[in-house]
Swiss-Prot record:
The gene is dinB. GO terms for cellular component: cytosol. This is DNA polymerase IV. PROSITE patterns: UMUC. GO terms for molecular function: damaged DNA binding; DNA-directed DNA polymerase activity; magnesium ion binding. Signal peptide: none annotated. InterPro entries: DNA/RNA_pol_sf, DNA_pol_Y-fam_lit_finger_sf, DNA_pol_Y-fam_little_finger, DNA_polymerase-Y, DNApol_IV, IMS_HHH_1, Rev_trsase/Diguanyl_cyclase, UmuC. It catalyses: DNA(n) + a 2'-deoxyribonucleoside 5'-triphosphate = DNA(n+1) + diphosphate. Keywords: Cytoplasm, DNA damage, DNA repair, DNA replication, DNA-binding, DNA-directed DNA polymerase, Magnesium, Metal-binding, Mutator protein, Nucleotidyltransferase, Transferase. It comes from the Bacteria. Poorly processive, error-prone DNA polymerase involved in untargeted mutagenesis. Copies undamaged DNA at stalled replication forks, which arise in vivo from mismatched or misaligned primer ends. These misaligned primers can be extended by PolIV. Exhibits no 3'-5' exonuclease (proofreading) activity. May be involved in translesional synthesis, in conjunction with the beta clamp from PolIII. It comes from Alkalilimnicola ehrlichii (strain ATCC BAA-1101 / DSM 17681 / MLHE-1). It is found in: Cytoplasm.
Amino acid sequence: MSQRKIIHVDMDAFYASVEQRDRPGLRGRPVVVGGDPNGRGVVAAASYEARRHGIHSAMPAWRAARLCPDAVFLRPRFDVYRSISAQIQALFREYTPLVEPLSLDEAYLDVSDCPRRGGSATLIAREIRARIHEQTGLTASAGVSCNKFLAKIASDLDKPDGLHVIPPEQAEAFVAALPVGKIHGVGQATRQRMERMGVRTGADLRRLTLLELQRAFGSRARFYYELARGRDERPVRPRRERKSVGAETTFGEDLNNPAEMLERMAPLADKVAASLHRRGLAGRTVTLKVKYHDFRQITRSLSGRPVQSADEIRARLPALLQDTEAGDRPVRLLGVTVSGLVTVTPDQARQLALF
């Protein structure tokens, strides 16, 4: 097994923690950052006080308000979050050039060749967390292991403000006890399919041969086969220019009603818009992805002036859906993607929303 030293750093309830830091009166109170609870927006982040009420990211804001009527709802300040994130990313690069940001609040670091702290990834992670708190007043959790898969899982085990290490010699035993839903790349639909096959843990997955996995999961088979053994050779890649932002969902039961399809796509538009806002991007092309019940897949696209808001994205979806066989053929998956990306400032984003 590879003896790389990988750290996954994940800020704790990042957006909500920034708001509690900047507004001391909110400390200890349930804080939700995201859309208007009286509208169709979604939760971008929830403080740990809010999470105790069952609130989580991507949840409709109206539902979060029902779960916790006393929660404080705030609009995101993405320009502030991006500034803090840039400060943290600069700190990471003091230790290694191999930094792969996943979003504003998390990143992988390959510190295999870092000489600091005697080359100990655990001590490096501890020092990074301490420096983040010293410089920003925010806490971060970190996971340390021999690959990205294990480091990311480890970072979630002692949240908030925690550090967890999975040594290479414990990797296989750790994955064996892991629910398959925690394995990288296993979404809800794949998890349900695995469970119907009697696969509920990493140990169950490991019992399947590569041929059995290929019959069930096609091109993803080798990936699952390796992860079930605690192996993940994906390198830490410094960020490359993003070409598109998208979200999709597979339905437990096929959809037949176009009106329901548009309703189900609204949260996807919200997610894409939130991602664009976080990155300071807008896009000229909106693409609809449709997978029918027989697994035939098509895409339809519309291009125009750059869009960033959820309302602008949703406005293009009816025409795209009308150009498909939705309503005549059952649909099992829908996806929304924005491409042709351009960088926009907060002022430019506000101007876009006026048109």
